[in-house]
């Protein structure tokens, strides 16, 4: 019974629609009615600005971290904490507090990794930042990073155990499932990337090249 209750708590934590609540409370805006209509970090940055975007990012990461830590906090043994992280991710993407329409699972998944292995989280964050610098697109970065991180759960335990000491089949299975889910949630972004109409950040190598071309014209 304790496991069921904590899984429900993890789902409810994940269901907190950070972007929606921040928008309504401080900006009198429902971000679902602006930009891409998504409740996650990227659309919050786009619609509400950098301070709000950073706040939502940290809140969404914290949801995954806190949920994954629940077994430790309540002395629950014999259960893999990743199950609680997955419950939070499901809450984030299908939030009961926002009509089951939520984000794209990236930030809360990162929070789950932070609780599971801080060193692997830092490694994964570096992958994300490098990919973002090279592409200037959050959507493409999220998908590429998900694939690379999934592969890393298999390779690193046998090559660089300092980052991820042991192979955990459940972590790999969850990573594969989340990667698939992230691709599904980004299907509209994939089409825009193909069409060359996907939004880019004013950050990174690609953004610099575009600015340089614009100046030369």
Curated annotation (Swiss-Prot):
The gene is plsY. InterPro entries: G3P_acylTferase_PlsY. The chain crosses the membrane at residues 3-23, 56-76, 78-98, 120-140, 142-162, 163-183. It comes from Enterococcus faecalis (strain ATCC 700802 / V583). This is Glycerol-3-phosphate acyltransferase. It catalyses: an acyl phosphate + sn-glycerol 3-phosphate = a 1-acyl-sn-glycero-3-phosphate + phosphate. GO terms for molecular function: acyl-phosphate glycerol-3-phosphate acyltransferase activity. GO terms for cellular component: plasma membrane. Keywords: Cell membrane, Lipid biosynthesis, Lipid metabolism, Membrane, Phospholipid biosynthesis, Phospholipid metabolism, Transferase, Transmembrane, Transmembrane helix. One of its GO terms (biological process) is phospholipid biosynthetic process.
């Amino acid at each position: 019974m304790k496991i069921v209750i904590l899984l429900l708590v993890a789902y409810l934590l994940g269901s907190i629609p950070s972007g929606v609540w921040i928008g309504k409370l401080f900006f009198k805006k429902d971000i679902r009615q602006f930009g891409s209509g998504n409740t996650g970090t990227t659309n919050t940055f786009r619609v509400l600005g950098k301070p709000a975007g950073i706040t939502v990012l940290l809140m969404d990461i914290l949801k995954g971290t806190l949920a994954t830590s629940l077994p430790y906090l309540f002395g629950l043994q014999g259960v893999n904490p990743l199950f609680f992280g997955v419950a939070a991710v499901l809450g984030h993407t299908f939030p009961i507090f926002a009509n089951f329409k939520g984000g794209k699972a990236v930030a809360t998944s990162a929070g789950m990794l932070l609780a599971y292995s801080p060193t692997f989280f830092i490694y994964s964050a570096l992958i994300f930042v490098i990919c973002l610098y090279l592409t200037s697109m959050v959507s493409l970065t999220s998908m590429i990073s998900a694939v690379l991180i999934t592969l890393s759960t298999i390779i690193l335990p046998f090559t660089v155990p300092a980052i991820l000491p042991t192979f955990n089949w459940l972590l790999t299975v969850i990573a594969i499932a989340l990667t698939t889910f992230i691709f599904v949630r980004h299907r509209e972004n994939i089409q825009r990337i193909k069409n060359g109409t996907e939004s880019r950040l004013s950050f990174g190598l690609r953004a610099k090249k575009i600015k340089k071309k614009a100046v030369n014209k």
